[in-house]
């Protein structure tokens, strides 16, 4: 049961074209029940912008950060959840997964008092995103 993160500057495309492909073939050929993702880091410009103007762009990148931090694949994992809309949060709290321990909520979701109590009763930690990962960017 191995977990690792491979980081590189991808000089001469060695990460994408060689290492990633090699790992992918090993997983496929050996029949491992494993996951493999290739992520690229980008830059979100914040100069001369208000926080709300670039928060949406940051939110688009949060899923990968959650998966990296928790060594999970969000769609198939029930211990963590990412909720980005009020409607999804209403559905999430109405059908709360028993195994969920952490929920990452978009910064524009405002839980009701009942929803907050439900999360506390079920010992579910709430992290507001993108602030959880990018708190140092707020002016």
Indicate where each model-derived feature is located.
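Accessory, often C-terminal, charged low-complexity segments
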Residues: 2-139
